[in-house]
Amino acid sequence: MALKSYNPTSPARRGLVLVDKSALWKGKPVKALTEGKRKTGGRNNKGHVTSRGIAGGHKQKYRYVDFKRRKWDMPATVERLEYDPNRTAFIALVKYEDGELAYILAPQRLGVGDQVIAGEKTDVKPGNAMLLSQMPVGTIIHNVEMKPGKGGQIARSAGTYVQLVGRDRGMVIVRLNSGEQRYLRGDCMGTVGAVSNPDNGNQNLAKAGRNRWLGKRPLTRGVAKNPVDHPHGGGEGRTSGGRHPVTPWGKPTKGARTRHNKATDKMIIRSRHAKKKR
C-alpha cells in the first residue's frame, strides 16, 4: 500500500499523509471471528489511572487473529485483506479447504486469491508457516514463536520482520529488527515474509483530533510542570530538567534498561545494546 498525500483544502488537511487503504475490504469483519471490546481509559479495576495518555477513541471490535497456525497441511485461499483497528498491520481472511474461516497477519506481497499453507515444512513463500528448523538460512520471517505452541510473539507489528541467520544444535539463530541476535528452539513456528503496511510509520496525522480517534491523549512534558507534580518541574524560566530523564515517580526512563529475565539471558547471543557506547 502506498502513501496518500492530501491537498491543503483546510488546516486539518495541510500536511496530511495517510496510508492508501483503497485495496482493503470495505465491509464489516466476519462476525464469528470478532468480539466486543470495552475501553478502559487507562484505568485498572479500582478506577485508578495505571497507563496515562489513554482515553476515548473510536469504538472497536476485536478480531480473533490466528497467531499459532497449527492447522497443518490444509491449503487456504486468501479471500480478502482487511483493516484491523487493534494493530498496525493489515489482516487477511483465509478460507481453508474444509470451509473454515480464519484471520491471519497479512505479510507483504500477499494478495487476494493467493494460497497459503502451514505445516512442518512448506514452500518458502509469503504467508506460509512452518517450523524454524526447516527454513533455509537467510529467510525473512514474521509472527515468530518463542515457545512451541504458544503462538507468534516476535515481529507482529507493521513492516517488521526477523531474519534467520544460522542453526546450532537443534536451535536456530535469528536477528531481530532491534539488532539483537538470539537463539530460538527449532520446533517453534514462523511465517515467511515481512508484515504488511511498512509505510505505517511514515504517516502524518496533521491534527490532534486524529490521535484522539486512535485513543491517545496529550502527554504533558515534565519540564512544563511544577516541582510538586514532576521531578523535572519548576525552575525560573525554561529549564532542561537538570538531571537524567525520569518518570513522574523518579524512575529512570529514556534508555534505562528494564530487562530482568536472567533465565533466558543465555539465549541472547548479541544484545541490542551492543552498539551503544560503554
UniProtKB/Swiss-Prot annotation:
Sorted UniProt keywords: Ribonucleoprotein, Ribosomal protein, RNA-binding, rRNA-binding
Keyword RNA-binding on entry: yes
Biased composition (Basic residues): 269-278
InterPro entries from the UniProt entry: NA-bd_OB-fold (IPR012340), Rib_uL2_dom2 (IPR014722), Ribosomal_uL2 (IPR002171), Ribosomal_uL2_bac/org-type (IPR005880), Ribosomal_uL2_C (IPR022669), Ribosomal_uL2_CS (IPR022671), Ribosomal_uL2_dom3 (IPR014726), Ribosomal_uL2_RNA-bd_dom (IPR022666)
Molecular function in Gene Ontology: rRNA binding; structural constituent of ribosome; transferase activity
BP GO terms, sorted: cytoplasmic translation
Domain of life: Bacteria
Subunit structure and binding partners: Part of the 50S ribosomal subunit. Forms a bridge to the 30S subunit in the 70S ribosome.
Described function: One of the primary rRNA binding proteins. Required for association of the 30S and 50S subunits to form the 70S ribosome, for tRNA binding and peptide bond formation. It has been suggested to have peptidyltransferase activity; this is somewhat controversial. Makes several contacts with the 16S rRNA in the 70S ribosome.
Protein name listed in UniProt: Large ribosomal subunit protein uL2
Organism: Novosphingobium aromaticivorans (strain ATCC 700278 / DSM 12444 / CCUG 56034 / CIP 105152 / NBRC 16084 / F199)
High-level lineage: Bacteria, Pseudomonadati, Pseudomonadota, Alphaproteobacteria, Sphingomonadales
The encoding gene: rplB
